[in-house]
């Protein structure tokens, strides 16, 4: 079973490499957006661990934690709701406040005989993301109702993507992915757009060995003020109802889509640049499962 499932996913992942050869022809507008951004950080700092390096602006991020997360495979994970292979996690802080993270998942694990049995969602999620990146349909995909379909993520978010905006494909030196503004919810609350807004990037390396998942908190100055997890209410302070809330989300999607990436805080292109600074040199990600034990390195 392991060989069949791995070969199926890798067969599709091979198609992702075609994107590398044709991206400059199909995504010229992405290149133009990147070129409009300064090419250097004000206070660049490069960190390197386990063969993975990235460069960030130490004037923006006051602290970075690098965590070698232990694997949590079935049938006996520490948390049955959070099953995952060993992975390398970069956590970013600004003035002691968490602002985002970049997580690297190995797509093979030599320490597990059956990858699908150990991590049931890893290969299907990778397959769905690889197919999206390869086929590149216009984003966001939509249901007949007009509501956006969820964008595949490597790790189960255990929540619903109920709001999407600024979704587009992005090519990096290390691979290809998709970036999008998103809000997640585990309940039916009518959360205001901006109350839990994140910018997320999901990608796969060109050599098909690592999947990358980045998530950063963002805001926009033109959004109506709202507190964390704030909700939309009518003039009497009551729920506006599902139909009205869906119309509100569609309106806000269009509203944010019209905003330039550089106008967000932090700018979306700065997050893309941070993720794009990743470099892999002699990375043995398939060996992380037998090596990582939770060690944390702090850079300040």
Residues covered by each model-derived region:
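Surface-exposed amphipathic alpha-helical segments
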Residues: 218-300
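N-terminal module-boundary/linker segments of secreted carbohydrate-active enzymes
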Residues: 55-60
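A short acidic-to-branched-hydrophobic micro-motif
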Residues: 64-151, 213-218, 222-225
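Sec-dependent signal peptide recognition
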Residues: 25-32
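Signature of long, low-cysteine stretches enriched in small and polar/charged residues
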Residues: 80-82, 128-209, 215-224
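N-terminal secretory signal peptides that target proteins for export/translocation
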Residues: 1-24
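Boundary at the C-terminal end of the N-terminal hydrophobic targeting segment
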Residues: 40-44
């Amino acid at each position: 079973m392991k060989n069949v499932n791995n070969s199926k996913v890798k067969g599709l992942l091979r198609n992702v490499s075609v994107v590398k050869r044709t991206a400059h022809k199909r995504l010229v507008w992405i290149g133009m957006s990147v070129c409009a951004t300064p090419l250097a950080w004000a206070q660049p700092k490069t960190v390197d661990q386990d063969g993975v390096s990235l460069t960030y602006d130490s004037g923006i991020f006051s602290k970075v934690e690098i965590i070698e997360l232990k694997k949590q495979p079935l049938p006996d994970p520490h948390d049955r709701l959070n099953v995952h292979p060993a992975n390398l996690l970069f956590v970013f802080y600004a003035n002691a406040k968490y602002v985002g993270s970049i997580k690297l998942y190995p797509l093979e694990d030599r320490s597990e005989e059956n990858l699908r049995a150990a991590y049931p969602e890893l290969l299907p999620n990778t397959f769905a993301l690889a197919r999206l990146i390869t086929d590149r349909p216009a984003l966001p995909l939509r249901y007949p109702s007009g509501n956006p379909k969820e964008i595949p993520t490597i790790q189960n978010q255990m929540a619903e993507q109920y709001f999407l905006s600024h979704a587009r494909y992005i090519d990096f030196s290390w691979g290809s992915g998709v970036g999008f503004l998103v809000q997640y919810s585990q309940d039916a609350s009518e959360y205001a757009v901006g109350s839990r807004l994140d910018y997320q990037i999901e990608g796969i390396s060109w050599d098909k060995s690592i999947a990358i998942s980045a998530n950063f908190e963002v805001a926009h100055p033109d959004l109506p003020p709202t507190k964390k997890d704030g909700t939309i209410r009518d003039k009497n302070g009551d729920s506006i109802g599902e139909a009205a809330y869906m119309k509100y989300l569609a309106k806000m999607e269009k509203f944010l889509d019209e905003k330039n990436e550089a106008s967000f805080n932090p700018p979306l292109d700065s997050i893309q640049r941070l993720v794009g600074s990743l470099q892999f040199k002699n990375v043995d990600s398939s060996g992380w499962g037998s090596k990582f034990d939770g060690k944390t390195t702090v850079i300040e």
